[in-house]
Amino acid sequence: MKKIEEVCERAQYALWNRFWDNEKEVFVNHYPVKEEESWIYWWHAHALDALLDGFVRTKETYYLERFEAEYEGAFRENGGTFLHNWYDDMEWMTLALIRAFDITGEKRYIEQAVYIWNDIKTAWNDSCGGGMAWKKDQLDYKNTPANAPAAIIAFRLYQRLHREEDREWGEKILKWNLDHLMDPDTCFIWDGMNRLGDGKVDYEWKFTYCQGVVIGAAMEYARITNNKEYLDLAGKVARRAVTELADADGIFPYEGPDDCGLFRGIYFRYVYELTQESSEYEDLKEIIKKNARVIAENGMNEDGLIGGDWRQKSEGTLDLAQHLSAVMTLEMAAKLGDS
């Protein structure tokens, strides 16, 4: 296999040269671009994260230039604001902007993050015993994708701005998520509840990114409290995901079209962070590397593009979400080094 850094660079090159629209100055959803492209806000938050990954790995300023172009393009395409109907979409953007602040030191990013966060907090309501709503026009549907990322935001803002209210928000959101959407026996994270207004949990919806964001929330809380129980919980969630969702070789298979394309990359982002917290997670490092090897050896086509099935090259129309997920997985593996 080529060095992982070379594979990352090829995937990042394809991201920019195949999905960037020079006229609209924003990423498009598909390559080749379709005649009609809908606006999918949250994919752009992860595009920003992927560009930051490239900068962290290379220190090449063109990644920050691309980040700024995509940041401005996404803001413009969303109507001159980062506020949105879907709370979880705004949460992904907020996390990307907090990270941009950490990397660049530019206060405008965290100021924008706080502005969005203030709107996100309107998601909390008493339906289902509390928790953050998924979207503004369905306030009684509560799910992990709207809650765990919000807890991560709250804990990260607390660590940067030292506002006690942020810590309190994070604690109550995380508690709700663990109380309502975690299997207490296995630590597997369920997606959501009351989607159809019947109060039921969607036990059959099993997704990698739900595991990833709870790993992230528990890990951030462990950092704040120095409570190893939450770090251990993050490890249990990460390992249960491998047992429940990966194949016999430890490879996470295609999860579905459209939004599902992003899920694995999100999981691996937070699993990577977990591996940096303790030496207890060598097995999880190997899982990241295994999946990256499969992408590099089997999943990348001649254009450097990667589809949903990492075990084979994809041709025809490919979407941004699937490619981004692979880029993020490769970038996490690059941080672990070649082996």
Could you say what each language-model-derived stretch is?
Residues 64-160, 167-171:
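Extended ligand-binding groove/face enriched in aromatic
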Residues 1, 45-60, 92-106, 149-163, ...:
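Well-ordered alpha-helical scaffold segments within catalytic/enzyme domains
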Residues 180, 184-188, 222-318:
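Non-catalytic carbohydrate-binding regions of carbohydrate-active enzymes
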Residues 154-158, 166-218:
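Active-site cradle of extracellular carbohydrate-active enzymes
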